[in-house]
Structures are given as C-alpha cells and as structure tokens.
Amino acid sequence: MKIFRKASELEPNLVSIKDKGQSIGLVLTMGNLHDGHLSLIREAQLHNEFVICSIFINPTQFNNENDFNSYPKTIDEDISKLENIGCNLLFLPEVQEIYPKGLAKKKIVNNFRNILCDKFRPGHFDGVTSVVDLFFNMIKPTNSYFGEKDFQQVKIIQDLVKINHHNIKIIQCPSVRDKMGMSLSSRNSKFSNDQLKIFDVLGNCLLYTSDAADETTGV
C-alpha cells in the first residue's frame, strides 16, 4: 500500500491511475478504523479498480477543542488494517497540508440543516462539507463511500455533489453494528462500561418494541 502525506506526492499517482482508465473508490475517514470503515473499503474494492482511503482528523468540524484533541488516534493499527485488507493507497495529510492559509470553513449546503445533529452542533456540517469539498477537488474519485450511520451527513454530502461535483457518485452503505446492536463508531471507545450496559438495555427494548409492532396487525 502506498502512503502519501502531501498533495504534491499524491497528484502524479492520481494522474497515472486516471491515464490507465481506472475507476477510483474513495473512503474518507478520521482514523481509529473499525469494521464499519473496513466494510466501506471492501465495498469500494468490489466496484473500483483502485481504492484510496484518507485519514484526516478535521479540526473545522469540531465544536469543542477538547473533543478534537481527545479524538482517538491509532495510526499504526490503522495502517496495518488497511494493508491487511488490500487498500491501494492511504492519504495521510497534516492539518497544514489541507489548510495552508489557516483553518477555514464555508456554508456550501443549505438543505437538511437546523435539524437532528446540525441543531445541536452548529457549524459542524460546514466543516464537514468544506473538507470533503477539498478532498473531492484534490482526488476527483469515481465513487465515494459513506455509512448510513451518519444519515444526515450522507444527505448533506449528496447535496454537495449536486452543487460542486456532478461526476462523483456517493454510495450509501449499511451500518455495521456490534453484538448489542450499536452502530460502530470511532467514538464508542469513550463510553464507560455503565453507559454500555444502559445502551444494551435500551437496544433490547427497541428490538422488542419493533418485533411487537411487526406482529400487531393494523400498526
């Protein structure tokens, strides 16, 4: 697996790939990779001749500096997982590489805003769409893969593509869940054992309610 940290190193390889007529599948991540991320890589491998994964903890999508600073970082393990799964290329830039003129974000998408996650994390999706826009302009993938776990994010990025990147196809992939039914997330490691026990109970209650509703006629 090739690893590049600078756009200037990445660009000649992208030119070579595209000159060969190969399709590019892109999976954008912030690292601390889990089976959910790897499922996106596998899906990209099924439908593309070349797969790129990026790892970049984007500071402009965090509302809290402590949250940014404490975000899990497991780069050695991440590289090993990507090599084992057969990812072709890892783009691993530093903040200065992506934001050479300083941190900046802009509002690109207006739909699906002021509700759900965006209501409680103002500016978060401006940071997300700004960095995704930068990566799409840099890499110009054929397809890019996102998990359904981040439903609002997927919808907003689909709108971003309609506005700025008409040739990129956004592929929405099913969430991968743990044995308790919780969607895998890099932040799950922050939960305490007591919090996980509460989720286990709530998850079972939701499953029971769903099964009961399915069995009830007229619901």
Placement of each model-derived feature along the sequence:
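Single conserved hydrophobic/aromatic residue that forms the stacking wall/gate
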Residues: Y208-V219
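Nucleotidyltransferase catalytic core that binds NTPs
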Residues: M1-S210
